[in-house]
Regions:
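Intrinsically disordered, low-complexity Ser/Thr/Pro/Gly-rich regulatory segments
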Residues: 1-254
């Protein structure tokens, strides 16, 4: 008989089944397979709460040339109760534009190139309707894990860049092991649901004016998304250099 307080392997494995460690490991490995330098267990100072928080995965793409270090800062959410529903709507002209989270010196040039960025880094086709919000469906209570995940991912991206000593860009990513649906409405007001593997939500953070983008990706599509981001991050770096940003970095800092 195990001593009192002792946990068997079976008990620990049962406990692990309800944690997100496996999803974090899979995500980090997927990005490593595509040439990213991926790190787990890094921390940041939450700019809102001033508390130290752990980041699930930080993945930096290894670029041949770039004006900045470019990271995917990833929040993993396992064990969601309900599907996540991504709301899409027609937006006024220019509201589909966004800029990545960046260090201060890059904010102005990225703002100038926001139309280029929206074209280079799409997940959905770069046209209306645009994904603008996310909610966890069929849950009880006020807690919304989907909205909370977007907030945590963007906070982690901003917190991570606070420590950056060189020009840096961060794209928040949320990886989830629950179904994803987009929600639109037809001309009669009837809801239209479509299941998908990933989407980009153009989200207005509390206290921030311009929209930023958060990629939401199902567990089964992480490898595909890492492959896509690697290509698009290099393309972004090349285009920003073409538009006058100096080539400044050639090595990783994760």
């Amino acid at each position: 008989m195990p001593a009192k307080g002792h946990r068997t392997v079976e008990e620990i494995e049962a406990w692990l089944a309800h944690q997100g460690y496996g999803l974090e490991h899979e995500t980090a490995e997927a990005f490593r397979r595509l040439g990213f330098v991926a790190s787990q267990g890094r921390t940041h100072l939450d700019p809102t709460t001033q508390k130290v928080r752990e980041i699930d995965v930080v993945a930096e793409v290894v670029l041949t040339r770039s004006p900045a270090h470019i990271y995917a800062v990833i929040e993993c959410k396992a064990g969601a109760i309900g599907a996540w529903v991504i709301r899409k709507s027609l937006l006024p002209w220019n509201e589909d534009l966004w800029i990545p989270i960046s260090t201060d010196g890059l904010a102005a040039p990225l703002h100038e190139q926001r139309a280029l960025i929206a074209h280079i880094l799409p997940v959905d086709p770069p046209s209306n309707p645009i994904a603008f919000s996310i909610v966890e469906a069929v849950t009880n209570g006020d807690r919304d894990a989907a909205y909370g995940a977007l907030s945590q991912a963007t906070s982690a991206a901003r917190g991570w860049l606070q420590r950056a000593a060189t020009p840096s860009i961060a794209l928040p990513v949320v990886v989830v092991d629950t179904p994803l649906f987009t929600l639109t409405y037809d001309a009669t007001g009837k809801p239209q649901l479509a299941e998908m593997d990933r989407a980009r939500v153009l989200w207005t953070e509390p206290g921030q004016g311009l929209r930023t983008a958060v990629d939401v990706v199902r567990r089964s599509a992480v490898l595909e998304h890492a492959k896509d981001l690697r290509f698009r991050f290099q393309w972004l770096a090349d285009k920003l250099i073409e538009h006058g940003l100096p080539e400044a970095v050639s090595s990783t800092e994760v």
